Amino acid sequence: MTNIEDKDWSRSEGDSWDIVSSVGFTALGVAAARAVENREADPLVRDPYAEHFVRAAGEPHLIGLLDSSEPKPPNPGTAPRHIGLRSKFFDEFFINATNSGCKQAVILAAGLDVRAHRLPWPAGTKVFELDQPQVLEFKDRVLAEHDATPTSDRREIAVDLRDDWPAALLAAGFDPEVPTAWSAEGLIIYLPSAAQDLLFERVVALSAPGSQVAVEATRGRPDIAKWGEMQKKYADEGHPMSKVDITTLFYDEERADVAEWLAARGWKVQGSHALELAAAYGVEIPELPEDVVEVVKQGNYVTAVLPS
């Protein structure tokens, strides 16, 4: 078994990772959260493969989380069912976008989500999944072991999003003349500010009129020190997130506000934080401590449409 306490959690220029190290571990943690969400009486997301990924990775803390009689979400210090809310937001985005004219979808930093397999895509929809080579290799191996069949024309692109991913995307059959649904979920905080700017410049350059974007972002510069304090405060002994400081993976830099950046380039933008999503989805959230509410409201789930 691989143990997260034995990993190096520092970042460096051009760093890479597998599914149980660095940024890759966050994808595994999110898969664990989706597996926990699956057990809700009325789950916000149904992901039949999430638990398979966690068990195949062999990370003992996350496996213990799933085997607990009362599993806790892997992200203490956030709104309860946060990953369920986040997953539903992006699920609904893709369903609505592809049913309103987007013929292809690009999932930037796809991680271990299996939207290409579990969403009801319109016939012929191309779904491009971009992520680190070792992450996609692990994902494909587990999916093959469980005879998973995509509900879309799935195309995996093993590439670092700090490199020339547009060339790889075009080589895989992406058509920049066709409206596209783009997503950046759990991504931009792990990018340097300059890399974030370049990412969205490339998205805009590749987007035909009618394209849509969904982004997990923040309102203003996130207080990463505060996030670290919250993690320590609410992760009890034995919780996976008590073993590592996930904020060491973030880039604490001044960066463009994604919603404002897209709006300045002619996109029609909307945004919500997780508590607003919960209200929209009819999810009752218990009263939260003030410091948790403050952090949750820093989040911004952005959707943007490029007018035709």
Curated annotation (Swiss-Prot):
Signal peptide range in chain numbering: none
Superkingdom field: Bacteria
GO molecular function, one term: methyltransferase activity
EC number: 2.1.1.-
Principal EC category: transferase
Keyword line: Methyltransferase, S-adenosyl-L-methionine, Transferase
Keyword S-adenosyl-L-methionine (UniProt): yes
Pfam family, one: LCM
Keyword S-adenosyl-L-methionine part of the UniProt annotation: yes
Disulfide bonds: none
Residues binding S-adenosyl-L-methionine, per UniProt: 131, 160-161
GO biological process annotation, one example: methylation
InterPro entries: Ppm1/Ppm2/Tcmp, SAM-dependent_MTases_sf, SAM_mthyl_Trfase_ML2640-like
Purpose: Exhibits S-adenosyl-L-methionine-dependent methyltransferase activity.
PANTHER family in UniProt: S-ADENOSYL-L-METHIONINE-DEPENDENT METHYLTRANSFERASE YKTD-RELATED, S-ADENOSYL-L-METHIONINE-DEPENDENT METHYLTRANSFERASES SUPERFAMILY PROTEIN
Family statement drawn from the similarity comment of this UniProt entry: Belongs to the UPF0677 family.
Protein name: Putative S-adenosyl-L-methionine-dependent methyltransferase MAB_4584c
Species this protein is from: Mycobacteroides abscessus (strain ATCC 19977 / DSM 44196 / CCUG 20993 / CIP 104536 / JCM 13569 / NCTC 13031 / TMC 1543 / L948) (Mycobacterium abscessus)
